[in-house]
């Protein structure tokens, strides 16, 4: 609404024609859960703006309830961990009744907006380049969507001084891959395999108190399932980057 009000006031002469503003809507992963309907509407109308999502995997400002991007089987205030549970939506161990994290960039890709990107502060140059590209797109082509992985030391139960490193581990495990989609063409902007930095998801999970329980022998089957899903998504993403028609 603010974007359209601005352009209408410019048309009427109430705002100078040469006033140049970049409109950015900032949302957490919780806002992208609750506000997914309006976000999709914004995408389908292709408004000239940027949607910037910072994803810390939970509803943190209300005490850390799980969101749809909370790591699979992670502990939260609404996902119990203990002998009968393995986290995430009161998952009862052995039943497999929980879900994997929501792939919001691919949801946005389905709306065919001009530009989609993922970023991480562990890779600052990549971050800045994509932010500049998103600004250009928002001024000349329509909607740009950027998703950043964002640390929450308090609720992740990991030391604040290690957060950039923890985020980098998520990227190197391909749990949070770095890529962009511009007019339907997918480009991997960082491939940990090429720099011999590829690591298993367990290497990221062990850095956070909310997922450490998954490294215990009792959860081997669940951990294998998580790794398989992350690998599946990574291989699909690589295939998209290698074949422009995908």
Listing of model-derived features with the role each one plays in the protein:
Residues 1-65, 123-134:
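Thiamine diphosphate
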Residues 16-20, 70-137:
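Conserved thiamine diphosphate
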Residues 48-50, 115, 143-145:
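Beta-sheet entry/capping signal
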Residues 53, 118-119, 145-149:
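Short, conserved beta-strand edge motifs with alternating hydrophobic and charged residues
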Residues 67-71, 162-165:
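Short, hinge-like loop/turn segments at secondary-structure boundaries
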Residues 140-143, 176:
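Active-site lining segments that contact anionic ligands and/or coordinate catalytic metals
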Residues 150-246:
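Flexible, low-complexity linker and terminal segments
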């Amino acid at each position: 609404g603010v974007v359209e009000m601005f352009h209408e006031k410019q048309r009427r002469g109430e705002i100078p024609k040469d006033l140049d503003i970049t409109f950015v809507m900032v949302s957490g992963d919780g806002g992208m859960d609750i506000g997914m309907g309006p976000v999709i509407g914004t995408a389908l109308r292709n408004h000239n703006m940027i949607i910037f999502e910072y994803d810390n995997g939970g509803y943190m400002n209300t005490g850390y309830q799980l969101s749809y991007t909370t790591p699979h089987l992670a502990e939260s205030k609404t996902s119990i961990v203990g002998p009968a549970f393995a986290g995430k939506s009161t998952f009862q161990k052995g039943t497999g009744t929980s879900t994997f994290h929501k792939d919001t960039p691919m949801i946005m890709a389905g709306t065919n907006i001009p530009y989609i990107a993922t970023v991480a502060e562990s890779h600052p140059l990549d971050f800045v380049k994509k932010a500049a590209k998103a600004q250009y797109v928002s001024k000349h082509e329509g909607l740009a969507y950027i998703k950043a992985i964002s640390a929450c030391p308090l609720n992740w139960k990991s030391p604040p001084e290690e957060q950039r490193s923890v985020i980098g581990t998520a990227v190197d495990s391909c749990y949070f891959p770095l890529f962009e989609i511009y007019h339907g063409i997918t480009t991997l902007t960082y491939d940990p395999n090429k720099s011999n930095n590829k690591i298993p998801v367990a290497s990221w999970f062990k850095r956070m108190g909310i997922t450490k329980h998954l490294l215990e022998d009792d959860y081997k089957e669940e951990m294998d399932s998580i790794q398989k899903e992350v690998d599946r998504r990574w291989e699909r993403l690589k295939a998209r980057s290698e074949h422009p028609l995908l």
